[in-house]
Amino acid sequence: MHNMSDIIEQYIKKLFEDTNEDVVEIRRTNIAQRFDCVPSQLNYVIKTRFTNEHGYEIESKRGGGGYIRITKIENKDETGYINHLLQLVGPSISQQQAYYIVDGLLDKSYINEREAKMIYAVIDRETLKMDILSRDIIRANIIKRLLHVINYY
């Protein structure tokens, strides 16, 4: 059984498929009513599963006519998407942000599930046992190197 976040994520991804567009606009209240959940549940899904690292841009307007506009960052070639991810990685990166990048690579089939699990193991805070700043710098270097390898090999 999937949890509510998974169900909402799949629904939004299906909207992209059904409309065959790179932009989907949804209303918080409509989604909350459809799935009998609170709007904050939708916010959680958007903030964790439709991030830049996953290949999406979000525009949000609150209030009476509020909406969430989700735009797929479509790069027609692998190099464009990888370069987009490289721009997102600064001199350091948190474990969660790095996981989002790996999730995006997996989602777009640049890596398989086994490779994703190996990458998670390498960039995990339990593997990189050191002070937070050093850990985040090393993690960023690992992710950048990984992206370069995907880009050029």
Curated annotation (Swiss-Prot):
This is Transcriptional regulator CtsR. Keywords: DNA-binding, Repressor, Stress response, Transcription, Transcription regulation. GO terms for biological process: regulation of DNA-templated transcription. Gene3D superfamilies: Transcriptional regulator CtsR, C-terminal domain (1.10.1200.150), Transcriptional regulator CtsR, winged HTH domain (3.30.56.130). The keyword Thylakoid does not apply. The keyword Repressor applies. InterPro entries: CtsR, CtsR_C, CtsR_C_sf, CtsR_N, CtsR_N_sf. It comes from Staphylococcus saprophyticus subsp. saprophyticus (strain ATCC 15305 / DSM 20229 / NCIMB 8711 / NCTC 7292 / S-41). It holds the Pfam family CtsR_C.
